[in-house]
């Protein structure tokens, strides 16, 4: 394993991080002939380290596991780890280094959509493969990216439908609270269109954005309470990302907001983010994901055991983006074996239809739009920082790359197989 850029121990709310050691310089290190190199492109410092450092460790766990089993195509797999430091332009620089200088076969990385958007032109220019493990806003399908997290129809829309229903409390007013960047803004655009189609009036929708790392939540939480005082059942849909979630939830507690009064459903808060928060006043608030550590099945039992043994800390938790990396890495390995090579074009073709029995308890399938079919789960926060699953789909849901709720997306197709061979078109590229 090579690691470039010194890492710092991010404050993962009291969780212990796997220390990373600086070795060689990326600009002078020649390609290693005896290994298959993959890139790990996650922030190990800055505002997103709280979420992304664990994803780096997840890939290292998967690499360790495959090497113990004899490697891939007769070679060891080598992880080349870099730290883009929550700096969006730096993501692109590090991606270019991984592809052009380190000659990695694939990259596993990014969390925020702004980081993914930053690296996308690099992957398309250099024909690299990115496995992106986090829920996002949709509205994209690149032949150089496999999206292993949730699209809006696999998280955001089902969560709002749940809260609108009797089981979820029958919410009538909505606060869409997000960090100010592309994922929250686009997701909320989709949710606003969905809510209005359900005859929710504009006066019953409040939208607010705050910067990354925001901490002064007193005024905004007071505004949420005032908005909810109109008399209709109110719910908060949170697309807040990174370490801003800590003071947000603390201020909810300080303001005496209980889930029975104003439920909050979060799309970027999971077990890792709750690890350092006193959750006794957050019991009953919700998160929507495709996996929770608390689900019971043999595959998840093995996943949790493998993680705790690798990280050498029984208190460390698993979460949804970790499961997405688990699925993505296994699918990449299967595709490489099927293709008999790490060649990007050959592996891409072999990815379609790959199946992995996932820790969620379901079998995930890679579709020709480069998105997974995944189950949807809604969990309630427990006192121990875990989640009780209160609702889930019966079967995996196929991701929509383009939203049926946006008029401008009407007729758009993402299908990278013949005759379409495109990620954003209204007619097939090839016709007989």
Predicted region positions:
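Periplasmic-binding protein-like
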Residues: 98-111, 131-133, 173-178, 231-242, ...
């Amino acid at each position: 394993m090579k690691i470039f850029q010194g890492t710092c121990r991010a404050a993962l709310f009291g969780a212990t991080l796997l220390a990373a050691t600086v070795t060689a310089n990326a600009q002078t290190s020649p390609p290693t002939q005896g290994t298959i190199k993959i890139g790990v492109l996650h922030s190990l410092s800055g505002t997103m380290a709280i979420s992304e450092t664990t994803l780096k460790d997840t890939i290292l766990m998967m690499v360790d596991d495959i090497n113990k089993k004899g490697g891939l195509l007769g070679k060891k797999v080598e992880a080349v780890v870099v730290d883009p430091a929550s700096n969006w332009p730096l993501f692109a620089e590090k991606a270019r280094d991984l592809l052009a200088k380190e000659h990695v076969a694939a990259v596993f990385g990014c969390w925020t959509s702004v980081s993914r958007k930053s690296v996308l032109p690099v992957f398309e220019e250099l024909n690299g493969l990115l496995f992106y493990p986090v829920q996002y806003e949709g509205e994209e399908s690149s032949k150089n990216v496999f999206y292993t997290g949730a699209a809006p129809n696999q998280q955001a829309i089902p969560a709002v439908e749940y809260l609108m229903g009797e089981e979820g409390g029958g919410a009538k007013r909505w606060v869409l609270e997000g960090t100010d960047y592309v994922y929250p803004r686009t997701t909320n655009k989709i949710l606003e269109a969905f809510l209005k189609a359900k005859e929710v009036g504009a006066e019953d929708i409040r939208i607010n954005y705050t910067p990354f790392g925001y901490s002064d939540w007193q005024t905004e939480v007071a505004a949420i309470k005032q908005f909810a005082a109109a008399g209709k059942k109110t719910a908060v849909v949170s697309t807040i990302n990174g370490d801003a979630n800590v003071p947000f939830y603390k201020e909810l507690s300080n303001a005496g907001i209980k889930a029975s009064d104003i439920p909050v459903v979060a799309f970027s808060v999971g077990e890792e983010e709750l690890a350092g928060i006193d959750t006794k006043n957050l019991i009953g608030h919700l998160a929507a994901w495709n996996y929770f550590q608390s689900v019971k099945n043999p595959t998840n039992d093995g996943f949790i055991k493998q993680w705790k043994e690798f990280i050498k800390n029984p208190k460390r938790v698993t979460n949804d983006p970790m499961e997405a990396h688990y699925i993505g890495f296994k699918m990449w390995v299967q595709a490489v074996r099927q293709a008999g090579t790490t060649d990007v074009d050959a592996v891409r073709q072999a990815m379609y239809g790959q199946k992995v029995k996932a820790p969620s308890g379901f079998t995930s399938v890679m579709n020709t739009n480069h998105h997974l079919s995944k189950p949807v789960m809604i969990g309630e926060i427990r006192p121990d920082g875990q989640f009780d699953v209160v609702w889930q789909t019966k079967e995996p849901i196929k991701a929509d790359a383009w939203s049926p709720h946006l008029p401008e997306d009407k007729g758009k197709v993402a299908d990278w197989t013949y005759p379409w061979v495109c990620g954003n078109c209204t007619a097939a590229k090839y016709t007989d």
